[in-house]
Amino acid sequence: MRAIRRFVSLLALALMTQAAGFAADHSPYDQKAFEAAQAADLPILLDVTAPWCPTCRAQKPVLEKLTSDPAYKDLKVFDIDFDSQTALLRTLRVQSQSTLIVYKGKSERGRSTGDTAEASISALLHKSL
């Protein structure tokens, strides 16, 4: 029984490690990193979120699922805190939490607010490729 449990644990770890290799790069918003991603003409997602936001919580598993697809391995995801990064929100013309903005390099390709549907979020992310 112990051997089976160990095998299952190692298998799960291996699968998580492999899946993590395909996942998009998530990090808190940093101006220099954002500009570097733009200069490299990478696909970018800005995820404006708040810890108290139920829509943001609903978006999270959808985004995790979609960005784990190998097609998005180069996608840079920057999390923007709605409550504390107000100057940045003004610059980006964001008025609400749960806003998603996609770029391909320096070109904004699309945005949505309050969307939790996997199909439409997938279509939005695809615009960054």
Predicted regions and their residues:
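Bacterial N-terminal signal peptides that target proteins for export
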Residues: M1-S9
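Non-catalytic, surface beta->alpha helical segment in thiol-disulfide oxidoreductase systems
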Residues: I101-L129
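Thiol-based oxidoreductase modules, predominantly thioredoxin-like and allied folds used
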Residues: V48, T67, Y72-T86
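Short active-site neighborhood of thiol/selenol oxidoreductases, capturing the structured segment around
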Residues: A39-P51
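Structural micro-motif
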Residues: P43, L92-I101
